[in-house]
């Protein structure tokens, strides 16, 4: 049975994600920007939280962990490589490790770039991937700690997941990301359509997260740095893919 997903808006533009196994009644949350909205969502559904999964150490993803742990008794799991700067962990995770939510099994994917210890969680039976600030709707996270080469390889790992995978990223950044993408390829029909769809969703107050991986592969410039058309668009026809990615990231940082 696929996991039930609840997207919980937090802070000004963050998301936390509740995942619930109806068969066993077990519930986990991915990232805790703040505890209040998550506790409210749990109470509204009568769910009990047993596990907190963390993608990376930034405060807007972990600030509510201690309050939520105290209120629910949930255990906390995060990257072993970042254990020294995450809230105290009950379970330290690395590439290929498995986490469970009820009967569902998720695999840990190390995705350095935004931070050096960033991880993602892929639940194949539910077609869900929780990517934090690595792969995002129409974008990717800034390179605060890692290199462009590291982030490019991380994005390649995520883009190799099944195309039907829903990408649950940590922020509502799609509108700005889409406007930036349109500056690179203003005449792309697929991009024009997606920019319009995102704008319409935001106008109606609907989240753009999660997004389909297939849509990201088709329109997200940070996944397309190896494509000839995008290399031509940025004037880097003969450059290595990671170099093109780095240039796109540099332009986005200044956008």
UniProtKB/Swiss-Prot annotation:
CDD domains from the entry? Answer: hydroxyacylglutathione_hydrolase_MBL-fold
Pathway(s) of this molecule: Secondary metabolite metabolism; methylglyoxal degradation; (R)-lactate from methylglyoxal: step 2/2
For Zn(2+) 1, which residues are the binding ones?
Answer: 56, 58, 114, 133
Q: Which residues bind Zn(2+) 2?
A: 60-61, 133, 171
* An example Gene Ontology molecular-function term: metal ion binding
Please list the cofactors this protein needs: Zn(2+)
Q: Which keywords, in A-to-Z order, does the entry hold?
A: Hydrolase, Metal-binding, Zinc
Fetch the InterPro entries from UniProt.
Clx_II_MBL (IPR035680), Glyoxalase_II_hydrolase (IPR050110), HAGH_C (IPR032282), Hydroxyacylglutathione_Hdrlase (IPR017782), Metallo-B-lactamas (IPR001279), RibonucZ/Hydroxyglut_hydro (IPR036866)
Q: Does the keyword Hydrolase apply?
A: yes
Q: Which GO terms describe its biological process?
A: methylglyoxal catabolic process to D-lactate via S-lactoyl-glutathione
Superkingdom = Bacteria
Family that this chain belongs to: Belongs to the metallo-beta-lactamase superfamily. Glyoxalase II family.
Q: Kindly give the NCBIfam families that the UniProt entry links to this protein.
A: GSH_gloB
Instruction: State whether it acts alone or in a complex, and with which partners, per the record.
Output: Monomer.
Task: Briefly state the protein's biological role.
Answer: Thiolesterase that catalyzes the hydrolysis of S-D-lactoyl-glutathione to form glutathione and D-lactic acid.
**Protein's name according to its UniProt entry:** Hydroxyacylglutathione hydrolase
Q: Which organism is it from?
A: Cereibacter sphaeroides (strain ATCC 17023 / DSM 158 / JCM 6121 / CCUG 31486 / LMG 2827 / NBRC 12203 / NCIMB 8253 / ATH 2.4.1.)
């Amino acid at each position: 049975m696929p996991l039930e997903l609840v997207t919980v808006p937090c802070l000004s533009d963050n998301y936390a994600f509740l995942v619930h196994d109806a068969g066993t009644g077990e519930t986990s949350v991915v990232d805790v920007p703040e505890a209040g909205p998550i506790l409210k969502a749990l109470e509204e559904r009568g769910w009990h939280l047993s596990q907190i999964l963390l993608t990376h150490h930034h405060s807007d993803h972990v600030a509510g962990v201690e309050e939520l742990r105290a209120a629910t008794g949930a255990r906390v799991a995060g990257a072993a490589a970042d254990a020294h700067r995450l809230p105290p962990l009950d379970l330290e995770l690395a590439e290929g490790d498995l986490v469970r939510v009820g009967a569902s099994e998720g695999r840990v994917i190390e995705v350095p770039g935004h931070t050096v210890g960033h991880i993602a969680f892929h639940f194949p039976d539910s077609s869900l991937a929780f990517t934090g600030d690595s792969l995002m709707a129409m974008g990717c996270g800034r390179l605060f700690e890692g290199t462009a080469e590291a982030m490019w390889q991380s994005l390649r790992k995520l883009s190799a997941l099944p195309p039907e995978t829903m990408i649950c990223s940590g922020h509502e950044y799609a509108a700005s990301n889409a406007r930036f993408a349109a500056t690179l390829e203003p005449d792309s029909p697929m991009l024009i359509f997606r920019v319009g769809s995102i704008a319409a969703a935001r106008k109606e107050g609907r989240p753009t997260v999660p997004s389909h991986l297939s849509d990201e592969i088709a329109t997200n410039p940070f996944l397309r740095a190896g494509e000839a058309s995008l290399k031509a668009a940025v004037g880097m026809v003969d450059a290595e893919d990671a170099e093109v990615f780095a240039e796109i990231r540099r332009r986005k940082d200044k956008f």
